Amino acid sequence: MLVRLVITILLPRPVTNWLYNKTRKVYASWYPTPDKQHHDRKQINRIRTAADFGDLCSIWGYEFEEHVMLTKDGYLLGLHRLCTPKGAQRTSIGMQANKPVVYLHHGLLMNSEVWVCLTSPDRALPFVLVDLGFDVWLGNNRGNKYSKKSIKYDPNSKEFWNYSIDDFAWHDIPDSISYILDLTKAKDLSYVGFSQGSAQAFAALSIHPQLNQKVNVFVALAPAMSPEGLAAPIVDGLMKASYVKFSIPRRPDSSPYQTHPHVPRFRP
């Protein structure tokens, strides 16, 4: 202790001042000031009480568009779009942005809000991408907060809710992508999926070969592919066979699935 004190006393004043300022910055980064803590709590409360996607965007000063598209089987899905960087002049709704297009899709039991409900815009991928010059779209599965309508069924009927992840892959993903490309006039887009949003894309790209021409990059964040506890020994054995040919039957309300001439080998 005495040695440290002597060394500190003997150090030149500029050196001690420099060390003092550095330690203050380190301390401030680890222990926020009361003003910053109050500001952070205020932002957290605003996020917690936000009613919808629009409220979450307005917290950070971003403009957005809301679109509704119709799937081939009659469901109305909500799409959200961010095409104007923060502080830039807003373009007319639905107008071509002439920018590279990115499509983000949420995970299980979520909606598009999951991408923008963070405590800093620097941590929200859609905000980062739109500021970098991308035309950002966020999708929603049928049945969630933004997709509870259909031209065929009443949302309160059993028929409306009679769907599964197969319908997400067969209709929701490809139809959403087609709507976006038709509106933006873009040739293709980049797909970012989170959890089940990745699984839906894997399935959609498999059963719709033409969809692969519309997706230039597929990014799977925390992809959900094989949930634990749902193992089926017979199916597992078939999938691990050396050569397996699959012919999936036609759905009554859709065009036939593609019959794949071969499936890559799966190793145990």
Region locations from a protein language model:
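Alpha/beta-hydrolase-fold enzymes
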Residues: M1-P32, L181-K187, Q196-P268
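Alpha/beta-hydrolase active-site loop
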Residues: K158-L183
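Conserved alpha/beta-hydrolase "nucleophile elbow" surrounding the catalytic nucleophile
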Residues: H106-L108, L189-S198
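Amphipathic alpha-helical interaction motifs in eukaryotic regulatory proteins
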Residues: H106, P126-D131, A169, I177-L181, ...
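Short, hinge-like loop/turn segments at secondary-structure boundaries
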Residues: D154-S157, D236-G237
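An N-terminal hydrophobic leader/cap segment in hydrolases
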Residues: P14-L70, H80-K86
